[in-house]
A protein has these predicted regions:
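Conserved short "hinge" loops at termini or chain/domain junctions
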Residues: 1-91, 151-171
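Exposed alpha-helical structural elements
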Residues: 8, 67, 93, 116-119, ...
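Short loop/turn elements at secondary-structure junctions
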Residues: 27, 100-171
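Secondary-structure capping and boundary motifs in well-ordered enzyme cores
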Residues: 90-98
């Protein structure tokens, strides 16, 4: 399940920026063609090449959102039981994370990527690591923690007792 849709990506960053990010590989792509491809109907009579470019861009953003969602699940799986409810209190946060990481992913050229995009994506990756480690908890709409995976911690607890002060045992 993808945490975000192409329509939400466009709502967040605008049709023009989305087209610019995706047009890098599709020189025929325009904002109108991308909008039409997402809507599933064509305005006017675009050529077969223009339709193919728009459909390829639509497929690229859809695929990027799906792969980013799978990437996020890799972190979340260690902390919570998946899939999460779409009506969950975390849905907006996870959607925003997915969109920001996908934006960095489609900004794969130096003429598209900015330092700010990378910083935002790094912040979201750090947040995912915090969720995975348990430093950040996801909550339900009711304000309770999302069902966890039942982590078990093992190892020796730290002790301030000076065990070295005991004389060695003689057998």
């Amino acid at each position: 399940m993808a945490y975000a849709t192409p329509q939400r990506f466009i709502q967040e960053y605008g049709l023009d920026e989305t087209t610019q990010l995706l047009a890098d590989e599709q020189q025929l792509l325009t904002s109108q063609l991308l909008s039409d491809a997402l809507a599933g109907s064509w305005t006017g009579t675009p050529s077969a090449a223009e339709q193919a470019a728009a459909n390829a861009a639509k497929d690229r953003i859809t695929r990027k959102l799906a792969t980013v969602s799978n990437f996020m699940d890799g972190y979340l799986r260690g902390a919570v039981t998946l899939p999460l409810s779409t009506s969950d209190a975390n849905a907006g946060t996870l959607e925003e994370c997915c969109i920001a990481l996908a934006r960095e992913g489609v900004s794969d050229d130096s003429d598209n990527a900015t330092e700010r995009m990378v910083q935002i994506a790094d912040r979201w990756r750090a947040w995912l690591k915090d969720v995975q480690s348990g430093r950040v908890s996801l909550i339900t709409v009711a304000g309770e923690e999302v069902a966890s995976r039942g982590r078990v911690r093992t190892g020796q607890a730290a002790s301030n007792f000076n065990w070295g002060s005991f004389p060695p045992r003689s057998y």
